[in-house]
A protein has these predicted regions:
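Sequence/fold signature of self-assembling virion shell proteins
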Residues: 77-107, 139-235
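Extracellular structured ligand-interaction cores
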Residues: 12-14, 123-125, 172, 220
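Assembly/oligomerization interface modules of large self-assembling protein complexes
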Residues: 1-31, 50
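Alpha-helical scaffold segments that mediate packing/assembly in large oligomeric complexes
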Residues: 30-114
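Helix N-cap / beta->alpha transition motif
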Residues: 20-25, 130-134, 190, 235
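Ordered core of a single globular domain
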Residues: 107-145, 149, 154
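Short helix/loop capping segments that flank catalytic or ligand/cofactor-binding pockets
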Residues: 27-28, 61-62, 137-139
Length: 235
């Protein structure tokens, strides 16, 4: 048994935005008056701005986790860059010409599943992570209509209506959609080998809001957020 060590080096990141109140106030007022379909309403304009900014940052972090590159401003190396640099070439498959679609998705996912070592297959934390377009193609392929050997009406005879945002699996391996993944990408990995690190976890949801009206008379709001983030792959 050989043990190795890898280190996560989180990158310092920050958000420094200037937002005009007018750009957000209409939607905030509608929410505060109860026109929103959501039950949890922002009790103050400041909390609305914090929620708005945090949601945007969360989307960017999700993309960074999969596709980020440390050389780009506001990014750290994601699993795509790390896997290319660290994994043996035999473990990396070329993307299918023309991209993944409902006609080839079963074969392409089969290649990924077949590459999983027998010692790893069946582990409870093994997943196939796929991009949104791959998941969409897989759902459509399982809808059938005489395609892909699934008969005229696919799973349970429901056609393309069979899927209602439930769980997916392939060859007994759970399938997870990585919202930040680029099109046509798939990874087979144990969740316990995929790491995201940050200095303090609550740093990723702490936002400072400065109302500039008392300082310069403008209708601007300055939003400041500082945090660290980085990824690493265990083997």
């Amino acid at each position: 048994l050989t043990l190795d060590e890898k280190v996560i080096q989180p990158k310092e990141l920050q958000v420094n935005l200037v937002i005009c109140k007018k750009d957000l106030q209409d939607s905030w007022e509608a929410e505060a008056m109860g026109f929103s379909a959501f039950d949890n309403l922002a009790p103050s304009f400041e909390e609305y701005v914090i929620g708005y900014t945090a949601a945007k940052v969360a989307n960017k972090i999700e993309t960074n986790i999969w596709e980020g590159a440390v050389g780009n401003a506001g990014e750290f190396d994601g699993f795509g860059v790390l896997s290319t640099a660290q994994l043996p070439g035999a473990n990396i498959m070329a993307a299918v010409a023309g991209g993944v679609n409902d006609g080839n998705v079963l074969a392409e996912m089969g290649k990924v599943a077949d590459a999983v070592p027998t010692t790893v297959y069946g582990q409870e934390d093994l997943f196939i992570y796929v991009s949104s377009n791959v998941a969409r193609a897989y759902v459509r392929a399982l809808g059938g209509f005489a395609a892909n050997g699934l008969g005229a009406n696919g799973i349970d005879g429901q056609g393309t209506t069979w899927y209602t945002n439930g769980s997916l699996s392939f060859d007994g391996i759970p399938v997870v959609v990585g919202k930040g993944m680029a099109n046509n990408k798939m990874y087979a990995a144990q969740k316990s080998n995929l790491f995201f690190g940050t200095g303090l976890l609550n740093s990723t949801n702490e936002v400072k809001v400065l109302d500039m009206s008392d300082l310069d008379g403008s209708r601007n709001v300055r939003v400041i957020m500082r945090f660290t983030g980085g990824c690493q792959i265990g083997t």
